[in-house]
Amino acid sequence: MDVLIESTRDFEQDLEQFSNTEKFKIIKKLNSYVELLSIDKNLFYKHSAQLRNIRLKENYDSSIYSLRINENLRIILTIDDDPIFERTVITLFRAVKAKDAAKAYNSVAETLYQDFTIENQEIEVPTC
């Protein structure tokens, strides 16, 4: 299955805060995770976490994850399988400091799921 990566304006603005060298390292690490996703999704998910238990209407599952890039950086993204076009779509929403990941995650979740959420409950997730 092909993987399509999309990024939001917020993600692009977050990246601008980094030097070119740091950006290169971030993108390189992200690409290694994308490759891992296409080979073995379970291994990919070991490097990511859902920071909030989000129950959606109609038995939909939340697709938001916090991906550990390094000790201090997380990328907030969604991973959606598109069976019609036989691809996985990754949307990059934010690149934030680890300490700000929960806040960014919640903000993205509230924006994406405002009309679909039936119950929100924050959960404690160990750092991945």
Map each language-model feature to its residues.
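Residue-level detector of alpha-helical recognition elements and their boundaries
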Residues: 25-30, 41, 45, 91-92
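Arg/Lys-rich, positively charged N-terminal/basic patches that mediate binding to nucleic acids
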Residues: 1-37, 117-128
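Generic secondary-structure microfeatures
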Residues: 30, 34, 38-41, 69-71, ...
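Generic preference for hydrophobic/aromatic residues in regular secondary structure cores
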Residues: 3-5, 48-57, 75, 92
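Charged, low-complexity, helix/coiled-coil-prone segments
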Residues: 13-17, 49-53, 108-113
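Short, well-structured alpha-helical interface segments that form or flank functional binding sites
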Residues: 6, 21, 25-28, 62, ...
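A short, surface-exposed loop/turn module that caps and links secondary-structure elements
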Residues: 38-67
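Enriched for short, Lys/Arg-rich terminal
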Residues: 65-128
